[in-house]
């Protein structure tokens, strides 16, 4: 056989370019993280082939697909070679370099590209079962028993910064807000990239879990079930709810400093739009104060005007939570806070 087909974990363990040959639409919905999309067929071509398959059968659909393939073979090769050349490879144990290719189900699309690359002695491998089997692997990963430690605390207690430092010091962390490109509040999308699809959000979490030693502690920030439009996988979220929880406490002054540092860099118009989205919950007086304070760059008043609202929301979400340990980090620097946090967990 001119190419090798690998099971998902074996496929993922090899080093080399990771090529997704599905259509751009399929790729946008969800893909293996760090993969490059070099589609065998664009969205329209895939639709045409699919229609022929339904109306006239597999044979005619394959013939039509081969026509598209023949016309763009040179362009495909150029794109493939460009991706391969730009990839900084790390040899595997056998010093072999593989081009990893996958399509929807491990069928003709990935096989066709593998055949093409094999002609140039480029050692392609394909994913057995394709992206469909990968998604099954992703969803299965959330049912594993995990040693999660949830970092909780009111808005402005520096939870995200603590999580970032934990990762810097090589502790196992999952930045759910980073993966979701959203901070989880009405201001959460400010300065962030477009949110990924929920499918892609799940893929990122699963890949991170795969890199961990499951028996060791995994730190995550306390979140609602939804982060913007991204929904935390149900089984993973249930484990978060039943895990150990460290509740960070800081003074109001500390919290205001943190919020001012985070949000004062954004455009006034963006901040005002965010305030208006929760005006019914803030009430007319606090909304007016917040909007005027943004206009006058009184960031302390802006943050104070919304802090009470978020504190009430947080207390409501915390109802029924057990296994909570309080950690007062008022006036402590973040490096010092990390040591205290780790000493209280590990």
Q: What annotation goes with each model-predicted range?
A:
Residues 18-22, 35-38, 174-175, 219:
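Short hydrophobic beta-strand that contains or immediately precedes a catalytic carboxylate
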Residues 239-245, 249-346:
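Conserved NTP phosphate-binding and transfer environment spanning the P-loop NTPase/kinase superfamily
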Residues 28-78:
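Glycine/alanine-rich phosphate-binding loops at beta-alpha junctions
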């Amino acid at each position: 056989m001119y190419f090798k087909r690998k099971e998902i974990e074996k496929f993922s363990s090899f080093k080399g370019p990771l090529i997704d040959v599905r259509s751009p639409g399929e790729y946008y919905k969800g893909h293996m993280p760090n993969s490059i999309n070099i589609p065998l067929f664009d969205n329209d071509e895939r639709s045409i082939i699919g229609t022929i398959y339904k109306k006239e059968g597999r044979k005619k659909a394959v013939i039509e697909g081969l026509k598209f393939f023949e016309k763009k073979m040179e362009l495909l090769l150029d794109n493939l070679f460009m991706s391969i050349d730009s990839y900084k490879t790390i040899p595997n144990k056998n010093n072999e370099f593989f081009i990893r290719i996958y399509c929807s189900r491990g069928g003709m699309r990935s096989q066709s590209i593998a055949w093409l690359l094999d002609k140039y002695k480029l050692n392609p491998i394909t994913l057995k079962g394709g992206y469909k089997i990968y998604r099954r692997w992703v969803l299965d990963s959330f049912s594993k028993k995990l040693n999660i430690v949830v970092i909780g605390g009111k808005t402005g207690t520096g939870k995200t910064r603590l999580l970032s430092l934990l990762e810097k010091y090589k502790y196992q962390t999952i930045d759910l807000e980073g993966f979701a490109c959203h901070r989880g509040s009405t201001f959460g999308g400010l300065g962030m990239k477009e949110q990924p699809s929920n499918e892609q959000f799940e893929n990122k979490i699963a890949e991170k879990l795969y890199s961990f030693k499951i028996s060791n502690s995994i730190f995550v920030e306390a979140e609602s079930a939804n982060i913007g439009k991204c929904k935390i996988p149900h089984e993973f979220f249930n484990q978060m709810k039943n895990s150990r929880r460290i509740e960070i406490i800081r003074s109001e002054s500390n919290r205001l400093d943190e919020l001012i540092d985070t949000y004062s860099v954004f455009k006034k118009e963006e901040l005002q739009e965010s305030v208006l989205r929760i005006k019914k919950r803030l009430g007319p007086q606090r909304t007016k104060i917040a909007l005027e304070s943004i206009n006058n760059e009184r960031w302390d008043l802006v943050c104070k005007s919304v802090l009470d609202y978020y504190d009430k929301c947080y207390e409501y979400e915390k109802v029924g939570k057990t296994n909570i340990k309080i950690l007062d980090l008022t006036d402590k620097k973040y490096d010092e806070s990390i040591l205290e946090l780790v000493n209280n967990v590990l």
